């Protein structure tokens, strides 16, 4: 087995950083973050094609989980190659932030929903921006996230069932309204006939 010296040194450096972050776990666990927010996240040194280094990541975990857990679920944002079916592009020149050098820059790149990962909140650095107010972007994230974790067919089947049920309910309401109108018409006709009867026959 051949071990790359450069890679080994990177893992050693990451181990030092990991020990530092581990010391912050308890206090960082109290940090409240929200779904759709973007933070710098120390992903460390990855293996193979795993995303690594300190990079922007979007919070994907629901807010209840974010409140009660020391961990959260994130997806990395990168300017590298992206697969359209499981990636969402950040709108250009829209979300500005101050980088580590104090310069104002814009968030750019693609949200890699094929690389979602659970991380300790201790890995989270500075807040960058909030994407949750962009309904169109968040809807695209949700749709592609469903596809990334293999739930597209399940959700499509559920959605088709809901759509079918809504149509059936609409038809039932229309039928009920029609029968109600017919019943009201019959009552009016009966009252009219009763009023037309001779007094002694009433």
Model-derived features: positions:
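C-terminal terminal-subdomain/extension
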Residues: 1-10, 90-202
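Compositionally biased, charged N-terminal/linker segments
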Residues: 1-32
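A general structural signal for short secondary-structure junctions and capping/turn motifs
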Residues: 30-31, 64-65, 101-104
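Loop/turn positions that initiate beta-strands
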Residues: 35-38
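Regulatory nucleotide-sensing modules
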Residues: 40-42
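Short, charged beta-turn/beta-strand-edge "cap" motif at the junction between a beta-strand
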Residues: 44-48
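Compact nucleic-acid interaction/catalytic patches
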Residues: 49-98
């Amino acid at each position: 087995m051949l071990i790359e010296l450069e890679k080994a040194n990177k893992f050693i450096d990451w181990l030092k950083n990991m020990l530092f972050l581990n010391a912050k776990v308890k206090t960082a666990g109290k940090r409240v973050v929200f779904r759709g927010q973007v933070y710098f996240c120390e992903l460390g040194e990855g293996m193979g094609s795993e995303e690594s280094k300190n990079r922007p990541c979007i919070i994907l975990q629901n807010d209840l989980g974010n409140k009660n857990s020391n961990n959260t679920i994130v997806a990395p944002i990168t300017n590298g190659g992206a697969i359209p079916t499981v990636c969402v592009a950040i709108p250009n020149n829209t979300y500005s932030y101050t980088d580590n050098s104090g310069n104002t820059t814009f968030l750019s790149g693609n949200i890699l929903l094929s690389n979602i990962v659970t991380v300790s909140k201790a890995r989270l650095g500075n807040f960058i921006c909030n994407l949750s107010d962009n309904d169109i972007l968040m809807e695209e994230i949700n749709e592609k996230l469903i596809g990334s974790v293999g739930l597209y067919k399940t959700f499509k089947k559920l959605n088709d069932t809901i759509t079918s049920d809504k149509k059936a309910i609409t038809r039932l309401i229309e039928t009920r309204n029609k029968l109600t109108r017919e019943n009201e018409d019959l009552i009016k006709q009966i009252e009219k006939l009763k009023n037309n009867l001779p007094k002694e026959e009433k």
